[in-house]
Amino acid sequence: YEMQRSLVGSEMCIRDRSPEVQKACDAMNNYLKASITYKMTNQNMVVNKDLISGWVTYDDNMNATLDESKVKEWLREFGKTYDTVGTTRSITTPGGKTVDVSGGTYGWSVDEAAELTALVDSIKKGEVVEKEPAYAQTAATHDAQDWGTTYLEVDIPAQHMWYVVNGAVQLETDVVTGLPTPERETPTGVYSILEMKRDKTLVGEINPSTGQPSYRTKVGYWMRVTWTGIGFHDATWNPSFGGSRYQTNGSHGCINMPLDQAASLYGMLSMGTPVIIHN
């Protein structure tokens, strides 16, 4: 019934000249004046009268209202289309290997709650605007590889990492990643550098039998990737890096680096730099 009323609204405006109907028509016509163009990657997404007319309803007193639940539903689909956090992306290593990587915390994420408020406000004011949506989180670019051209990359099977700046490799080294067990493997996905600290003590999970941390290790250069304790750091206790060492003497999930390389990387790196870890 409500939907029918919203669809016949424009005809009603022509047929019925009563003050109540005219008031509803004025409100609806104001809504339908709105045109919000979201400037997205490959195409613009436009919210105009074609969409808005389906979101306007009338109550028994002929008050025209915007059904925010329908706007919210549309924004949820909009977010699904343009959010990239956790999605599958493709990367080609400096060595020429192309792999898919999914998961992680890095990428675009539309702030649907904030955008709902903004969109409803624009429609009610009958605004004509071009904009980007509100984002809860942004990435370097809207390209398919949204981390851009400056990033850290870790190839677990190759036990090798690269620091790429503006498309050119600035540093590369063999590494030791997590022991390949469910508890200790290095997580794959697209992340970013969350914290950088000198002379940090890494503390393992509490061992239930002793009540003590499973390890307490001091490192000179700490570059955090996840809040669950994964990061890049120097590992002076490792006699060698690369090869198959990780399969028997792997870390607890961190990316272990030679001291000189960890120091060099720390000196070059910026907070927020994207990190791609893949098999």
Predicted regions span which residues?
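Single conserved hydrophobic/aromatic residue that forms the stacking wall/gate
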Residues: Y1-I14
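Extracytoplasmic
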Residues: K33, G86, W147-T149, I156-A158, ...
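Second-shell loop/turn segments in exported
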Residues: V56-T65, V101-V110, W147-T150, S209-T210, ...
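Extended, domain-scale alpha-helical bundle/helix-rich regions
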Residues: K70-E73, E77-S102, G107-E115
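Exported/periplasmic cell-wall-interacting domains
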Residues: E73, G204-N279
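Cell wall/extracellular polymer interaction/catalysis modules
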Residues: G103-E183
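Structural recognition of the beta-strand scaffold that forms the well-ordered cores
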Residues: E153-V154, W162-V164, L171-T173, S192-E195, ...
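Solvent-exposed loop/turn segments at secondary-structure junctions
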Residues: A158-M161, V169-Q170, L179-P182, K197-T201, ...
